[in-house]
Amino acid sequence: MKMKKQCATLTFFIGLHGYTIAEDNPKNISLSVITVPGHHERQPDRSIITQNEIDQKQSDNVADLVNTVPGVSMAGGFRPSGQTLNIRGMGDTEDIRVQVDGATKNFEKYQQGSLFIEPELLRRVSIDKGNHYPQYGNGGFAGTIKLETKNAKDFLQENQLLGGLLKYGYNTNNNQRTFSGAIFMQNDQKNIDALVYATVRRAHDYKRADKTPIKYSANNQANFLAKVNWWLTPSQLLAFSKVHGNHNGWEPFAAKRDLLPGPTEAEITKYGLDLAWKRKLVAREQQDRSYSLQYQFLPENNPWINTVAQLSHSSTYQHDTRSEQASKTYLASLGNESWTRYTDLTFDVNNTSLFNVAKTSHTLLVGLQWVKHKRQTLIFDPSKLQKAEYNHGYFQPSYMPSGHQYTHAFYAQDKIKIHNLTVSIGARYDYVKNIGKPNIATIYNDPTAGHDYSSKHYPGWSSYLGLNYKLTPYLNLFSNISNTWRAPVIDEQYETQYAKATLSPTASSLDLKKERITQLRVGKQIHFDHILSNNDQLSFNSTFFYYKGKDEIFKTRGVRCFESAQNNNNEVCSKKIGNYRNLPGYQIKGFELEANYDSTYWFTNLSYSHTIGKRLASPRNPWLASTSWIAEIPPRKAVVTLGSHIPDTNLTLGWKSEFVRRQDRSPTDQDKDAGHWALPKSSGYALHGIFATWQPKQIKHLRIQFTVDNLLNRSYRPYLSELAAGTGRNIKLSISKQF
C-alpha cells in the first residue's frame, strides 16, 4: 500500500500542472470532411483510435476495439450485443456518454450490452475520460466516447468523382465472414460529397481455448451507412449522417453472461435437443438507428462567429420472443415476449468567438441544448392472461418502467491564454424533468404501495476549471477540476414492486437526490520530434485522477432503514420505501502512463493503468461504519506493442501483448453479506497477438490485413465479464480493393 501511495504521489508531482477543459477544436466538425484521418490531437486525457488502428484490430464490436486503451475495459461476454464499457471503474450506462456522429446513444437493459455500432463503419474513435466538458451534462461521469463514421473524402483520390470499395474478411475462431461494399462520389465543384457503405457479418459460435463452443454466440447482422457533406458556400457546411444496424438470432436473454442453464436429459428426450435448448433462449430482433443533421457557419473574416447547430435522433429497439414450448414463468426476465425501445432526440446550438482583451486572447464558447429521452417497455406474461390486475398479461415490467426525461441546458466556457498559460473557466446549467408512465397493470399502479409516476424536477449548476501551462516546447502541464451532477434515470426513479412483495421495497423513488461528483486530474505531456532520425516522434503522457462522489444513486436491497441496520430485521421499516436510495458516496483514484515512439522503420507503444475505488459504506447497508471495495474496479493492466515499418514493400508488422493482474478485491471483504453486489475474484493472465498490413505496390489500392488474437491460445476469464470464458485463438484476414 505504501508503494502504491508513493506511485500516485510521484505521478501527481511529475506533472504539477495546468488544466484545460479538453474540448473539441471549435473549427472541427464531427461530420466534416476537413478532419485529417489519423490525426492525433494532443488534448489532455484524450485517447484517439485512428482509421489504421481500427482496420488493424478487425474487431467485431466497439467494446473490443477500445479494450486496450489505458483506463478503458470491456465488460460483458462475447455474444452479439453482450458488451458494455468501463472507464476508470465506472460502467453504468448513465456514466458513459456515447455519441455516433454527434447523436447520443442510450440503451440500458438487464444483462444486455449498450453498444451496437459496427466498427467497420468507423473512421475514428475518441475517448475523453472524466466529465470536464461543459458541453455535456447530466451524467457521463466516466467520460464520453465519440464514434465518427467514414466520409467519402476518406476514399476519394485527387480529382476522382466516383469510386467504389469491396472488402472481404474471415475469422477462423467462429468461421465469420464479413462482406463490405461502398460507393463514394463528389460533384465537379467538389463542394458536395456522398458515401454509401454496407457491411454484413455471418458467423457461427465462438470457441474457447479448449475448443468448446460458447453456445448461441453466432453473429448475424447487417449494417448500413449513408453520409452527405454539402458546402453551401465556402463558409457554410450542411452534413447528414444515417447509420442503421440490424441483428437477429436465437440467444440467451442475458447476452452478457457466459454459461447457460442447459436442458435436462428429460427435456431433451421430450422436446429433442434443438427445441430443448431453444426453450431456454429468446429469438431476438434488434434494430439500431442514428440520424444526425449538422449545420456550421464560419465566416472567413469574422472571428466572432463560428456557429454549429445539430439535430440528432437515435433509437435502439429489441423484440424478444420465447418458444411456444417455453415455460410460462419468466416474469423476472421480461416474460415470454417483450418490446423495448429507447430513443433520444437532441438539439444543440453553440457559437465560438475569438477575441483579445489587453494582453490576453479569449476563446468563448456559448451554447444551448435540449434533449428528449424516451423509454418504452412492454412484456407479455402468459401466466397472467386471466388476471385483470396484470392487464391480462400485457404490461410494463415493474423493474424496467417507461417514461420520459427532458433536459434543458445552457453552457459557457472561456479559454483565456496569457503567454504560455491557458486558463479555462466553464459553467453549465441543467434543468432535468423526469416523467413516469403509469403502469397499465393496476398491481404496479397502486398508491397504497407507494407507486407514484408523477414528474420530478432536478435543476442545478456544474462548474469547470482548468489550467494548461506549456513549460517548454516539449513539455505541457495540465490540471482540471470539475463539479458536476446527474439526475436519476427513469428506471431509478420509477421502479416498483407489488404491494405484497417481501424481498424488495415496493415504492417508486421520488425522494432521490441528485448524485454529485468532484473530479480532479493532473498530468503532463512530453513530445519530441527528430530524436534518432529526421522523421521520428517520441511522446510520454502521465495522468493522475481522483474522483469523489456523493449521494450515489443505488438500488435499495439488504438493510432498508436505520432501525434494521443492527439486526437485519426489515419488518421494522416503513412499507413505502423506494426501490432506489442515495448512498453516502465513493472515492476512485488512480493513474495512467503511456509512451509512444514512431519512426520510419519501427514503432512501439507502452501503457499502464491502475485504478482503485471504495464506497464510504456497504452497498447493502449505508449505515455500516466501514468502507467497501467497489466491485466494478478493473484490475491493473499493461499493454505493449512493438512493430516495424518496411517502406520498400509497404508492409507493417507488429506484436501486441496485454498483461492483466488478478482482481482480488471485493465488497465481501468488508461485508460478508454483500455477495449480490460483488463480482467473482479473478486470476491474472497475459494475451499475445500479432498483426500485419500489406499494401502491395504492384496492385494499386489493394490492402491486406492479417491479425491473430490470443496467439498462444490461452484460457482466460476477464474480471468484468463475471468470469465468462474468453475466446481462443482467432486468426483474422481481410482483403479490400478500392476502385
Curated annotation (Swiss-Prot):
Keyword list, A-Z: Cell outer membrane, Membrane, Receptor, Signal, TonB box, Transmembrane, Transmembrane beta strand, Transport
Membrane topology: Multi-pass membrane protein
Subcellular location: Cell outer membrane
Coarse class of the protein's main subcellular location: membrane
Every TBDR plug domain range: 38-150
Keyword Cell division found: no
Alphabetical list of Pfam families matching this protein: Plug, TonB_dep_Rec_b-barrel
GO cellular component, one term: cell outer membrane
One term of GO molecular function: heme transmembrane transporter activity
Record keyword Signal present: yes
Gene induction: Expressed only under condition of low heme concentration.
One Gene Ontology term from the biological process aspect of the record: siderophore-dependent iron import into cell
Residue span(s) of domain TBDR beta-barrel: 161-739
Signal peptide region: 1-22
PANTHER family attached to this UniProt entry: FE(3+) DICITRATE TRANSPORT PROTEIN FECA (PTHR30442:SF0), IRON III DICITRATE TRANSPORT PROTEIN FECA (PTHR30442)
Family: Belongs to the TonB-dependent receptor family.
Known function: Heme receptor.
Name of protein: TonB-dependent heme receptor A
Organism: Haemophilus ducreyi (strain 35000HP / ATCC 700724)
